[in-house]
Amino acid sequence: MMSHSSTATLVALLLAATIAVPNPGAAEYTQQENIVYGHKDGLGLLMDVFTPRKQNGAGVIWTVSGGMNSSRRAIPRITKFPSFRALLDKGYTVFAVMHGSQPRSELEEIVKDMPKAVRHIRFNAKRYGIDGDRLGVTGRSSGGQLSLYLATAAEGANPNAKQPIDRVSSRVQAAVAYFPGTDMVHFGKRDTTILEHFRSRGMKADATFDFHKWSPETSRFERVTDRREQLKFYRDLSPITHITPDDPPVLIIHGTDDKIVPFQQGEVFQAKLKKAGVPSELFVAKGKKHGWGKPLDGELKAFIDWFDRHLLNKK
């Protein structure tokens, strides 16, 4: 049996892990670290919550991801991004969501994490001081891809779900994605998968796309090696596959000289959104590669205005 003193110590440790840490910088906000938004394989899925002093009632999920790897080591760098600071300055509560990472998790498992975060945030909206029906999402590179998959493939509310938290919708109301992958079957050029593209550039990304299927014959998960089956995975996990007219408004920001995630990915996605009647824009970063430093002229305004327009109803 755990003693009273041991219990008190455990509670103190748990509270310390999620305590609000005042930020000494220019933007006035508090940071709550290591909030558990869900579980996977017995492990907690974590996020940090950044609450500005003057909240505007809306929230933006920042998908912490690069190369389908997510770690809190990236958060200090992310908090220095002008776009991140701008969200806080404008009163948005920012949820820095970390997902399961490759090589431990492959993409089919990774995409299941973001909806859990949305449901947790929406279910606890009052606790976070926001309106649960005014949620946006943003991310860069693989974070942008996961943000778009969430925007297009997330499910609505299921009133018959066993758990109350699963009865709320995992859909968001707006998305902004920086240089995202969108079509993993035709990545840069037709009939070239995302993995083939990465391999052609000497990039090691196999673990992300190491797909497996359950085999009743062997009673274990077997690696998918058949080309047609692999293409089905790529297709089903591509954001472009799931575009429908009821998707949230999407802004894509992409560099024309991006060799890692070709500019074509942003173009084809925005074209299909337009065809489906989904409000969308493509901010063209002329001459820019896969990421850049100082924001371009009009970039930060486009980023903030998108969320203001669709989450705050500002014209």
Regions found by a protein language model. Give the residues of each.
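Primarily recognizes the serine-hydrolase "nucleophile elbow" in alpha/beta-hydrolase
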Residues: 69, 119-194
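Alpha/beta-hydrolase active-site loop
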Residues: 105-126, 301
